Amino acid sequence: MNKLISFFILVTFSYSSCETTKNIFGNKAKETTVEELNTKVLEKTIIYKTFSGKANIDITGPNISQSVNAQIDILKDSVIGISLRVLGIEGARVMITPDSIKILDRLNQQYIPRSFSFIETNFSLPITFSDLENLICGNPVFYNNTTLSQGISDDKYVLFAQKDVYKNTIWLSADLDILRMFIEDLMNKRTLTLTYDEFDKIEGRQFAFLRTILIDATDDFTANIAFSKITFNQPFEFTFNVNPKYERID
């Protein structure tokens, strides 16, 4: 369960709904400048105060083949709360803040507090709390508005951007919805591929409901995640109470 939790924290954030309809992109990409495309990408950024959603997640990798259900709640810039269930029973609860990650492993009756640097230490990935929020909402990650170049391929816009040692190739539909991101770690020779499908509008926001995550590194992982019952800007309740009988793992 601990290995599953660690992997889930890293790649948990993609969506699908059993009630959505697939968006067929009818428009064609038109010639534009890098500056115009950057501006349009920023205009498509999802703005919110709270997010809530349920997910069905299938994860495969070395020594992992697991399906879980998850409830994910976000209070923007403050906390990400995650409840993981297997066969209807909560196996773990995770609370992430900008400076900490706290895990309740109910199956092993353990409390595992960590600093936010746990992610970088274990995965050599300098991801921020804001990056995690962007992953959940489908906003660009490892993208600091510094686009090296852009082009058009098969009626899709292609952006080439770089942030530190991370090179990000982003494919956009003619409607400027993110279809795929291919992130290369130029120093450690690792890649992260995010694909997006099943677009629909949720409360006026164009949203990719089906995503696949591929990590190509020392260990290779795949995650297929199906999200449903998504809401924005609605109150939610997320509790994180540590049972005094749980073993603390420092």
Could you tell me what each predicted segment is?
Residues 1-18:
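Sec-dependent bacterial lipoprotein signal peptides
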Residues 18-66, 248-250:
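N-terminal leader/targeting segments and the immediate start of mature chains
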Residues 20, 149-250:
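Gly/Pro-enriched, hydrophobic low-complexity segments
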Residues 49-57, 66-74, 78-84, 92-94, ...:
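One face of beta-strands
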Residues 58-60, 87-89, 201:
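Hydrophobic lipid-interacting interfaces of membrane-associated proteins
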Residues 71-72, 91-93, 169-171, 198:
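Short, surface-exposed charged micro-motifs
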Residues 80-130:
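An acidic-aromatic
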Residues 122-151:
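C-terminal low-complexity, charged extensions that often adopt amphipathic alpha-helices
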